[in-house]
């Protein structure tokens, strides 16, 4: 079996905040939580969430998050400034994600990829994560390959052919990625408007 993480980056340039960017690179659960929060908010807001949640709770431990009182976790998400546009729903998602990591990987989020047998297995493991749809899975595959050096048989053929967060290696690259994403969405809206 070929293994996964051969090199963790020093930081992932997703937030503009050095502490948050370092946490994303150094704590696999933080990275997964950032992806769980990456919905209907800017990338910077979503991926800043894990560091702020750690400040509010004093930890980012999968077992403690999974076992937390849902009301207390909800309060941590709602405290101003709220961690997300939909704090209650995201508190539940993060708790479900933590529970999944505890149940399947003994609380070690890195095992999602370090224990994967090949690209297909890694893709299955990511798809099984609560709140991870196809776009998030493809983006995670690219990040793991490009930023963490994960090399598994059959992984390269699963990598997306379009820009993803996996291509972001600097604040400038994040700005380019976000501009490309906005332009793509504008094209889709224009095509839908022309067809209707």
Language-model features: locations:
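C-terminal accessory module of base-excision DNA glycosylases/AP lyases that mediates lesion recognition
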Residues: 1-21, 26, 119-128, 134-196
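Structural motif
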Residues: 19-30, 40-42, 84-89
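Alpha-helical ds-nucleic-acid-binding substructure associated with the helix-hairpin-helix region
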Residues: 53-128
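Amphipathic alpha-helical core segments of compact helical bundles
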Residues: 38, 95, 99-102, 145-149
């Amino acid at each position: 079996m070929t293994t996964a993480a051969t090199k963790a980056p020093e930081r992932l340039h997703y937030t503009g905040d050095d502490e948050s960017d370092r946490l994303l690179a150094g704590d696999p659960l933080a990275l997964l939580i950032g992806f769980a929060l990456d919905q209907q908010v800017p990338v910077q807001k979503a991926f800043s969430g894990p560091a702020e949640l750690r400040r509010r709770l004093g930890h980012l431990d999968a077992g403690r998050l999974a076992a937390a009182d849902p009301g207390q976790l909800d309060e941590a998400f709602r405290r101003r400034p709220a961690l997300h546009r939909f704090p209650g729903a995201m508190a539940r998602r993060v708790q479900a994600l933590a529970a999944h990591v505890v149940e399947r990987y003994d609380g070690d989020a890195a095992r999602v990829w370090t224990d994967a047998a090949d690209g297909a297995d890694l893709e299955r493991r990511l798809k099984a994560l609560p709140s991870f749809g196809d776009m998030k899975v493809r983006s995670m595959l690219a990040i793991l390959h490009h930023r963490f050096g994960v090399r598994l048989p059959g992984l390269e053929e699963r990598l997306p052919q379009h820009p993803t967060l996996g291509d972001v290696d600097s604040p400038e690259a994040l700005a380019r990625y976000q501009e490309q994403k906005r332009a793509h969405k504008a094209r889709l809206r224009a095509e839908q408007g022309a067809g209707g």
